From Swiss-Prot:
Its cofactor is FAD. It comes from Bacillus subtilis (strain 168). Binds 1 FAD per subunit. This is Ferredoxin--NADP reductase 2. One of its GO terms (biological process) is cell redox homeostasis. Belongs to the ferredoxin--NADP reductase type 2 family. One of its GO terms (molecular function) is NADP binding. Keywords: FAD, Flavoprotein, NADP, Oxidoreductase. FAD binds at residues 37, 45, 50, 90, 124, 285, 326.
Length: 332
């Protein structure tokens, strides 16, 4: 296993939106920063699961595509140098006798004066389609993630699911795909009422209450066989792509073994965003405190608090309250 013996000021676990803003703010406080991300790219769930979706509750943006928000955060972060480690899952964090944190991933050992974890809901994976031959079509035309709407242009697309993601993808693909069908096991969708209203007003083929029964096709799925719930009807759809939106399962995984105070799968923090371990901070959906609201906007506020207090932890002479950003950048 490789070992990076450099001791960084701040190591951030998680490269989602809150992690990226944390890295930028660490640069503003003149800290050396490292980001460790388990996925192959930065952006967290926004990039991996919802890159084409619009976000409406980020201050200053009437609406912004998820991937555009990530791109903006990466551009903002690029004002400073960071070390970025992708496809590395942190397996253990240990505070050594000298106060330096030792972080061990599946690839490398890292060292840091402080740690800020911004890992969202922890590791996540999609709920798989439980049909006998489903796995053989993964990576072909069975999709659990949609990273580019245009690859479905002119194609016949079936979507399984009844939540917000399924309905949103159906509505966004309607003007792009040749044909879109959405299949849900219940007549009533779980998605937001306004989205469901738009769905029924659209040209999307809504099939309820049906469940997938069989996938037919040699190299790729060519037909999707549906069975009516508590009924005898069957439907066979000719399709080019199948998108499964059955939600995702998240887990804190090894984080539970790091000696942190955990409450309902969240890390308990003080008003400084520090955990029960001195020098170990948390921000974003991974942490909890009285009155906590899980929003990206909330995480963007928690990130500077974590960084400024991490700076004061490393250097007691440093001010927790930073200078205004205008004074920091006006000569740059």
């Amino acid at each position: 296993m490789r070992e990076d013996t450099k001791v960084y000021d701040i190591t951030i676990i998680g490269g989602g939106p809150v992690g990226l803003f944390t890295a930028f703010y660490g640069g503003m406080r003149q800290a050396s920063v490292k980001i460790i991300e388990s996925l192959p790219q930065l952006g967290g769930q926004l990039s991996a699961l919802y890159p084409e979706k619009y976000i409406y509750d980020v201050a200053g943006f009437p609406k912004i595509r998820a991937q555009e928000l990530i791109n903006n955060l990466k551009e903002q972060m690029a004002k400073f140098d960071q070390t970025i480690c992708l496809e590395q899952a942190v397996e253990s964090v240990e505070k050594q006798a000298d106060g330096v944190f030792k972080l061990v991933t599946n690839e490398e050992t890292h060292y840091s004066k402080t740690v800020i974890i911004t890992a969202g809901n922890g590791a996540f994976k999609p709920r798989k389609l439980e049909l006998e031959n489903a796995e053989q079509y993964e990576g072909k035309n069975l999709h659990y993630f949609v990273d580019d709407l245009q690859k479905f242009a002119g194609r016949r697309v079936a979507i399984l699911g009844g939540g917000d993601s399924a309905v949103d993808w159906a509505l966004m693909l309607e003007p792009i795909a040749k044909e879109v069908s959405i299949i849900h096991r219940r007549d009533k969708f779980r998605a937001h009422e306004h989205s469901v209203e738009n769905l029924h007003a659209s040209k999307v083929n809504v099939l309820t209450p049906f469940v997938p029964a069989e996938l037919i096709g040699e190299d790729k799925i060519e037909q999707l066989v549906l069975e009516e719930v508590k009924g005898d009807r069957k439907e066979i759809l000719e399709i080019d792509d199948l998108i499964v939106n059955y939600g995702f399962v998240s887990s804190l995984g090894p984080i539970k073994n790091w000696g942190l105070d955990i409450e309902k799968n969240s890390i308990v923090v003080k008003s400084t965003m520090e955990t029960n371990i001195e020098g170990f901070f948390a921000a974003g959906d991974i942490c909890t405190y009285e009155g906590k609201v899980n929003l990206i906007a909330s995480g963007f506020g928690e990130a500077p608090t974590a960084v400024n207090n991490a700076k004061a932890y490393m250097d007691p002479k440093a001010r927790v309250q930073p200078l205004h950003s205008t004074s920091l950048f006006e000569n740059k």
